[in-house]
Amino acid sequence: MNVVWKGFYSIIFLLLIASFPLLIAVENGAITFMPGQALETIQTSFLPEKFMKYELGSEIRSIPHDVVSFGMNTGILLTYSVLLAFIISFLFGYLLNRTSFSKWIRRGAAVLSVVPDFVFVFFAILFAIQLYRATGIRLISLSPTRPTLSIWVPVFTLAITPTIYLIRIIALKYEELLTEDYVRTALAKGLSKRYIDLHHLYRNLKPFLLADLKKVISLTIGSLFVVEFLFNITGLTKFIFVDYQFQKTAVGLLVISLLGLAVYILLRAILYLFEKVMIDG
């Protein structure tokens, strides 16, 4: 029942965000709050002739039909980026505590964590341009009429923020767990590093990972708008922000939320299968 109420409140919250541009108007240089106009527009959007439709120039288009293609691009970008972030952060987090310069890498990750997303996008675009000049290989297109040519440059760029966050969390927790008595006892017994990593470290690290999954996905979705816009990706960012209309904005935000939920479920399933196969299997 709590899940139903959370879902209901989430939908209401998304509708409020989508209606925000309708609540504010500028008249004679002054900002006016107009809840009546917003409520009227929302009510009108549920009329049979306007429900789940939006205007594109002089054409009336179906929102469900168009949101699928936009959502596919965003879904692929979001899923690949989060999975890549988990793979890289697990490898780095595992290796960091076995190197002498782990503290320096953690400090570097802490510094990078305050860098805005658009800076990473800028350097990714700069790298793609230099690569094209040197090799003739074109990875991206900066033309507003052409989509980006390779999904992997945006994927790697979008994965930077969650990767940095996860590296800091995993490395810190690994360092704490290595000082626990049960780990020291296992080492004293001569158990293999692989056994200790899987049965003692991973199992005690997993609750922290599950607790931070939502934050990781939220960080990635926050960066998603910047990456899609600057890389000129035909995704839900364009669907939502180009030519604002309440219905398509509300549906676009809802689809992004559902994609985030799908990625969350996928990651939990992967962690569950990893434990069953690698530890219990």
Regions found by a protein language model. Name each.
Residues 144-187:
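Membrane-cytosol interface at the C-terminal ends of specific transmembrane alpha-helices
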Residues 109-161:
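Generic hydrophobic transmembrane alpha-helix motif, especially the helices
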Residues 154-162, 231-273:
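Hydrophobic alpha-helical transmembrane segments of polytopic membrane proteins
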Residues 61-95, 209-217:
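Transmembrane alpha-helix signature in integral membrane proteins
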Residues 11-16, 194-227:
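Transmembrane alpha-helices
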Residues 22-30, 211-241, 260:
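Non-cytoplasmic
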Residues 80-110, 122, 224:
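Transmembrane-helix boundary motif in ABC transporter permease subunits
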